[in-house]
């Protein structure tokens, strides 16, 4: 009993410490909540939330599992200097609410494909972090004409 209790307390402390390491920019960032540039697109049965920053060649940023637009707070302004940055809350993440009972990488990659169609973007560059990388890779595999890099 004592070992389990100590193990549980240790796990709580470690997890709490990990979350406290997020830079303040993530906690106080406008990204993911910017009403001036935030929009919803009706994509495959749900409303997909996205924000667009900058001008130039399109670049879509795809966050990882459990993440949101806010996870790219440190990168958006940098890339927006030279690109039209499209940051998206993936299906069932952030402001993109989906109450469906299934979720897959293929499903999410097709969501991004449809969003690009909705935005009339013929091709773009992709940066994906963690599971966002998987989604970007599948998007490139299934729709190679839409992905530059």
Where do the model's predicted regions map?
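Alpha/beta-hydrolase fold catalytic core
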Residues: 2-59, 82-83
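Glycine-rich, phosphate-binding/catalytic loops in enzymes
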Residues: 6, 60, 76-80, 102-105, ...
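Conserved HGGG/HGGXW glycine-rich cap/lid loop of the alpha/beta-hydrolase fold
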Residues: 46-95
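Active-site loop/oxyanion-hole signature of alpha/beta-hydrolase fold enzymes
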Residues: 87-128
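Conserved hydrolase catalytic core segment
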Residues: 122-149
């Amino acid at each position: 009993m004592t070992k389990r209790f100590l193990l549980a307390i240790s796990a709580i402390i470690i997890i709490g410490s990990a979350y406290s390491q997020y830079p303040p920019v993530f906690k106080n960032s406008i990204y993911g909540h910017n009403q001036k540039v935030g929009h919803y697109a009706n994509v495959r049965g749900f409303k997909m939330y996205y924000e667009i920053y900058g001008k130039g060649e399109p670049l879509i940023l795809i966050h990882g599992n459990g993440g949101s637009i806010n996870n790219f707070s440190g990168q958006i302004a940098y890339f927006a200097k030279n690109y039209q940055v499209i940051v998206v809350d993936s299906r069932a993440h952030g402001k993109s609410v989906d109450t469906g009972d299934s979720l897959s990488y293929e499903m999410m990659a097709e969501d991004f494909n449809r969003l690009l169609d909705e935005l009339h973007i013929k091709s773009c560059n992709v940066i994906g972090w963690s599971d966002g990388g998987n989604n970007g890779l599948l998007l490139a595999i299934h729709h190679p004409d839409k992905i530059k890099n």
